[in-house]
Amino acid sequence: GGSNALNSFMSLMSGEKGDYFATHPLLTEALSGCEDSCDVIGLNYLTGRHVLEHELHPHKAVLGTETYPADIVRLWRIVEENPHMIGDFTWAGYDYLGEAGCGIFHYDGGANFSSIYPERTAYIGDLDLLGNRRPISYLREIVYGLRKAPYLAVLRMEHNGQTSSK
């Protein structure tokens, strides 16, 4: 229960499930009062709503205020193709202590946010605690058009043929 249940729910909110939730009429109704009073509409984890917001509020800018790092390919395409989109802030650029293991890929059916001792970091940032780049940072660099050279990331052999939690 509590925050772990909410975090587990949020980890499901990407792809088609996330888009269904993001564009549901009940959410549109719930957000309308707040959005009507803002000049810029900031959305956390609602990438599927970015284009819809322009249809609902054609004179307002939209910003991804928190998004999943692995959604960058899809998200950046939306930003580039829609002038009302002014950018994106991913969660999180730098890894941090707390929410232990929320960025770890599980191959045993385990859910995100179900850390195993001795995990301490979220393991989700583009940079680790020491400032070293993690593989997702290279993907972001490629998506932004800042890197032309290939980057090779390798799946550990013990997980060959297994499906990950993300």
Describe each region flagged by the PLM.
Residues G1-K166:
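Extended substrate-binding grooves/exosites of carbohydrate-active enzymes
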